């Protein structure tokens, strides 16, 4: 039982990246996550942020959930039935001013939350012949890029976002998640 009395909920200490100005909190909300998961998602998030945004200070929360939690959020916020692999909830649009202090009054801006679904990610990794940690890293990168304003609604935007994901993942030593070696993409 956690300090707030909720079974299964566990907050990690906020960790400020030495690579970027990103402060990351990992919240284990639900699901059977490996002990190494916190480090996997932190590494992916900080690298995505460093590549896409630079060294500006910011905070984000990564929520480790299960299919039931993500299905509930998916229905409530997107009107869609069932779980998905990752959801992103931006706290505010990050204006491209180059100086977040000017917009956020000196406070560290909160990017938002990235919520991951354990069972869906495991199922997809198996179906697509990917390592679980690699697929988890990809979806974490994907979620962080959404918090930074990237989307894939139009083909040109999808191409740009996927290229950025490929570059970030290559830096992390992870194969192209959209390549021919991964069916189902």
Swiss-Prot record:
Binding note for cofactor: Binds 1 zinc ion.
Keyword Cytoplasm: yes
Domain of life: Bacteria
GO biological process, one term: rRNA processing
UniProt cross-references to Pfam families, sorted A to Z: YbeY
HAMAP family given in the database record: Endoribonucl_YbeY
Record's protein name: Endoribonuclease YbeY
């Amino acid at each position: 039982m956690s300090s707030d009395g909720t079974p299964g909920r566990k907050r990690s200490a906020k960790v400020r990246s030495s690579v970027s100005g990103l402060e990351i909190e990992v919240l284990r909300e639900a699901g059977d996550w490996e002990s190494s998961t916190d480090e996997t998602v932190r590494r992916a998030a900080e690298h995505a942020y460093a590549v896409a945004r630079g060294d500006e200070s910011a905070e984000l929360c990564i929520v480790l959930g299960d299919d039931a939690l993500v299905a509930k959020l998916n229905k409530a916020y997107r009107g869609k039935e069932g779980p998905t692999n990752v959801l992103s909830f931006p706290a505010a649009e990050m204006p491209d001013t180059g100086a977040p202090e000017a917009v956020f009054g000196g406070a560290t801006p909160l990017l938002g939350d990235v919520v991951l679904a354990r069972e869906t990610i495991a199922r997809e990794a198996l179906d697509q012949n990917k390592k679980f940690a690699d697929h988890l890293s990809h979806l974490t990168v994907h979620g962080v890029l959404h918090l930074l304003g990237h989307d894939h609604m139009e083909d040109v935007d999808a191409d740009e976002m996927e290229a950025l994901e490929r570059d970030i993942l290559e830096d992390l030593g992870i194969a192209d998640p959209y390549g021919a070696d991964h069916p189902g993409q």
